[in-house]
């Protein structure tokens, strides 16, 4: 939800440009650009959701965050992104593809540039290890499955 209404990040084929995350994706803590805690090792869209595998750095600060993720204290995930194309849907109207009812703003072409482990996510349906129940043997020390936000407040965009 943006300050003026619902924001939807479209995950349809061709909507998300993952190039930046694939080439130089970083993992931050709470969107702080000076709090790099890891790197993105793999990113993809599947089932209209974004997914990523990350690797935490080995420094003390990153290790602290990794431990909080592993213990379940930190569960929130968010993405920083840029939008190239918006569809504005007026109250009570349908989006061009008929999937959404207004009022809302739909990012039809957008590019994530960072993934953050966050204390308080804008969208509580997205987070760390949502698929870990299916893969209990996964090694959280080296990589964690993440889902990107569909709805995201981008308070830290500069």
Regions found by a protein language model. Name each.
Residues 1-140, 157-158:
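Signature of dsDNA virion morphogenesis modules
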Residues 143-158:
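Polycationic, low-complexity disordered segments in secreted or periplasmic proteins
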């Amino acid at each position: 939800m943006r300050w003026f209404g619902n924001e939807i990040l479209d995950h349809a084929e061709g909507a998300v440009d993952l190039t930046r995350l694939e080439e130089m994706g970083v993992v931050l803590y709470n969107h702080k650009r000076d709090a790099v805690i890891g790197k993105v090792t793999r990113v993809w869209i599947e089932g209209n959701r974004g997914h990523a595998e990350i690797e935490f750095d080995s420094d003390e600060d990153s290790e602290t965050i990794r431990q909080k993720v592993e213990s379940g204290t930190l569960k929130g995930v968010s993405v920083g992104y840029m939008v190239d194309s918006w569809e504005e849907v007026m109250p009570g109207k349908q989006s061009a593809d008929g999937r959404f009812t207004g009022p809302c703003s739909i990012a039809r072409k957008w590019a994530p540039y960072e993934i953050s482990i966050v204390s308080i996510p804008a969208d509580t349906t997205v987070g760390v290890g949502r698929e870990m129940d299916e893969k209990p043997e996964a090694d959280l020390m080296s990589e964690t499955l993440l889902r990107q936000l569909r709805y995201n407040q981008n308070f830290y965009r500069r």
